[in-house]
Amino acid sequence: DIDVHDWRLGPTEVEQHRVPVTSAVRTWLDIARLRPLSDGLAVGDALLRSRVGISAEIRTSIDARGSIRGIRRARLAADHIDGARETPLESGSWAYFVEHRVALPAMQHEIRSRDGRFVGRVDFWWRHAGVVGECDGRLKYTDRADLYAEKRREDALRELGFTVVRWGWQDLRGEALAQRLRRVLA
């Protein structure tokens, strides 16, 4: 799909080295304003992982735009971008939590056994409820050895008394995942 939008570009946003471009921040801002929150978070999270100090540039860019269409959505995305999320599915999951008012978890949390042995690093961690959240794409465990290792890791988490909730892209549609999370977080 191609979306065409008319919005004036600044001189550094139009051309660099004789190639027509928009800056990384400008591109993010357009995505954050005009696309779903999950898209703005996925691109923003990647920007934060790739460039130190970009967060201030993002805020300055938003503030300079005043009240253009979609700016509130961009502000919401800016409030939630975080370089700790490592995949678009993790970013999409965070957007889902925000949109469905699910309690926001810690991210990329290390879990250790009672004797201090490393058990694993989990995508999402709701400490107050002892709940681990794992989001998995279809291609994550195509190798049998990886699948078996993940099963053993999940068994170890459950043996420590944690509830493990898993989801994929398809679960980010509708209310079922939010209801399931609210139930285990209560």
Q: Where in the sequence are the language-model features?
A:
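Phosphate-handling catalytic interfaces
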Residues: D1-A106
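Surface-exposed beta-strand edges and their flanking turn/coil or helix-capping segments
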Residues: D1-V4, E15-P20, L89, G120-R121, ...
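Short acidic, glycine/proline-enriched helix-loop-strand junctions
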Residues: G66-S67, R75, R117-V119, F124-W126
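Conserved active-site beta-strand-loop modules that form the wall/rim of enzyme catalytic pockets
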Residues: S93-Y96, H100-H109, G120-F124, G130-V132
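Basic, glycine-rich
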Residues: E110-V119, W126-A186
